[in-house]
Amino acid sequence: MSIKSKEDLLNKQAEVNEQIKSYTCRVLVCSGTGCIASGAQKIYDEMATLCERIDGVTVEMQKDVPHVGVVKTGCQGLCELGPLMRIEPYDYQYVHVQPEDCKEIVERTILEGKPVERLFYRDNDTVCPHPDDIPFLNQQTRIVLENCGKIDAESIEEYIAVGGYQALAKVMGSMSPQEVIDEVTKSGLRGRGGAGFPAGKKWSQVARQAEKTRYVVCNGDEGDPGAFMDGSVMEGDPYKMIEGMTIAAYAVGAENGYIYVRAEYPLSVKRLRMAIEQAEKYGLLGDNILNSGVNFHLHINRGAGAFVCGEGSALTASIEGNRGMPRVKPPRTVEKGLWGKPTVLNNVETYANVPKIILQGADWFRTIGTEGSPGTKTFSLTGSIENTGLIEVPMGTTLRHIIYDIGGGLKSGAAFKGVQIGGPSGGCLILDQLDAPLDFDSVKKLDAIMGSGGLVVMDENTCMVEVARFFMNFTQRESCGKCVPCREGTKRMLEILERIVDGKGEMSDLDELEELANMVQNMALCGLGKSAPLPVISTLKRFRDEYEEHIRDKKCRAKVCTALRQFHINPEFCIGCGKCAKNCPAGAISGKIKHPYHIDNDICIKCGACKDNCNFDAVYVEA
């Protein structure tokens, strides 16, 4: 059935909601990449099989056999605790669900309405039966992620049921293209891909170009290590992003659009394709959308995983079939982008904000966040923290609130050391900056960038020199090689960092690192190259004493840098079992059975096999 008007859309919404209400229970199995990796597909298959038996009247426990729906949702947020499951209408949130739990869930929850309490989340000693009871979830403000984990990620009907495509109907029915641009501009929405450029201003620049062939492009590449926000949106609610892109196309007069998504996101690609096909089937994409005479065709382009293709001009070059390399600007993509035509280029999260802005209004959007950065921001919260996962909070939220109130604090009570924000192009923030607001302008003042939204929390067991080396290794390998400052500068910086972590550094290396970092930052061709030295700049500024210890004292206080570690055996704890010696690949451990063993550090290759295999904590490390 093709939807040709707002009335058709509302009728479809009512029809689908009636179908959903007919279910006695709905089993929402998290089927995001994280939960699938921990076995969610088996959970889904088992629940579907068991619930089919219920509907097939093979269950004799009660006369009124329940009508049960089992659906695959997007990410439910608590990624570390997967596989996750929610049961409606009871609103139970189950964590760490295993296939063997499914029978009990059916028998107790679906048939009797009683919870399986051992599967509830626990916040210390507090049992949290419902999502709203869980601090990780109840302290978020979800706009972009509002449907993720709540609707079938592969059903456009369920998106329509929660109000999907009503913003598009409003735009097509009662707003001119300029009115759409004005509303987005008034909202203050800034691009969520890292730079924070005002979305409305970008759309306006494309709309006023003389060239009438225009494109709308979505950057779904998300190349930062540890970042999974955009991927989760594409997996869990691709329709919202597509609706936002369609509204953008109407606003700027584009008839074709491209979603650039990395090949390492196969689930995102699969669900995007399904979403596009379903939208075309319902007349919400393609020719004559909502019988308005407006055409917009959407295509998927799979990238090869190059980090540099997150940069606008490199991304458009890749779509064109060329090598993904940034070019000198101007002209910018709004003037000459894809195939030399004016192009709107925003990321997944930016487009996903648009439908809500159109429906609720720019003034509503500005009540959330800060004056200079309205709205919310999604973050992937990872590292040494109790609760890792996907979060969405108002702009201006402090790191302290995110780490301690939402994330539950650091693991095992370890002391906080720093948090890396913005991935390999970002910087490291420290204890004194925990109360700084997270918005584009405030973070920039701290020698970091918001980036796409990766937050890696680090404790006292993290070596900041190694962190800088890790990120520099990434950016150096991902450099496209076009400009000398980035190609050669990052290579030289990496050589120095590797020398320092190997205990071969000199004090003069620190001055050279700073000089190189400033050179790359000021002279690299593209934004990715200019931001590549930020992890080095921020760690040198805030943890210079650690660099000096590595050089002067040949010491790594976190006991992370392999070359600066020494393994020893405590004779008081060693029972002489010989297990360490058997597992030592270098033959560096000697001794007699039932007598304390000894490690020869001249032979030891510092692999740590002895420590890993000792059951009595007799092996210890000195830095």
Which role fits each region the language model picked out?
Residues S31-G39, E80, V184-V206, G305-A317, ...:
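Conserved phosphate/anionic-ligand binding catalytic regions in large, soluble enzymes, centered on
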Residues K150-Q166, C218-D230, T333-L338, S380-I385, ...:
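Gly-rich Lys/Arg/Thr-decorated short loops/hinges at beta-loop-alpha junctions or inter-strand turns
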Residues F120-K186, G340, N346-G361:
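Flexible inter-domain linker/hinge segments
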Residues Q140, V269-M395, G407:
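Hydrophobic alpha-helical positions that pack around
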Residues S2-C25, Q41-V70, P83, E88-Y121, ...:
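Ferredoxin-type iron-sulfur electron-transfer modules in oxidoreductases and energy-metabolism complexes
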Residues G375-N387, V393-M395, L399, R557-N601, ...:
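C-terminal accessory/binding modules appended to enzymatic or scaffolding proteins
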Residues G244-T246, G396-K411:
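Short amphipathic, charge-patterned alpha-helical segments
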Residues L81-I87, P485-K491, K579-H598, A609-A623:
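Iron-sulfur cluster-binding cysteine motifs and their immediate structural context
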